[in-house]
Amino acid sequence: MVQAPSKTLTLAEFLQLPETKPASEYIDSQIIQKPMPQGKHSAIQGEFVPAINGVVKPQRAARAFPELRCTFGGRSTVPDIVVFVWSRIPRDDNGAVANTFSAAPDWTIEILSPDQSQTKVTKNILHCLKHGTQMGWLIDPDEQTVFVFRPKQEMEVFDA
């Protein structure tokens, strides 16, 4: 994980910066660059988005987005996958999906990468739950485990 501690930026100033690859996030007034996804991470992400959309998108119930910047509650993060209920998807004047998402997703999914802090990722999920997210998943590919977080409930753990 790369941190750029140069000067303290506001969230508004951070959002004016050009995007980085991999994405950078704004958390607690710090810019933190996400690690580059590796094979297991990419394989899981690549399977989940179409699987979720195959179920929820035809009914216009919800839609899954990979690597979508969500800015809310003083942070700007890029979860691996977010799902928004159809009626909450921001739209532009033409009715197309907007470029800017300034709300917490309904479901956030993070896939742990080898170079990523489980604590940092868990804090991002908890931040989402605090701001209206209904469910958060933390997938640990190496342990073949999914941690499921819901507001005001005990975390559940599912092993493969």
Where are these regions (language model features)?
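Gly/Pro/Ser/Thr-rich low-complexity, intrinsically disordered segments predominantly at protein N-termini
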Residues: 1-160
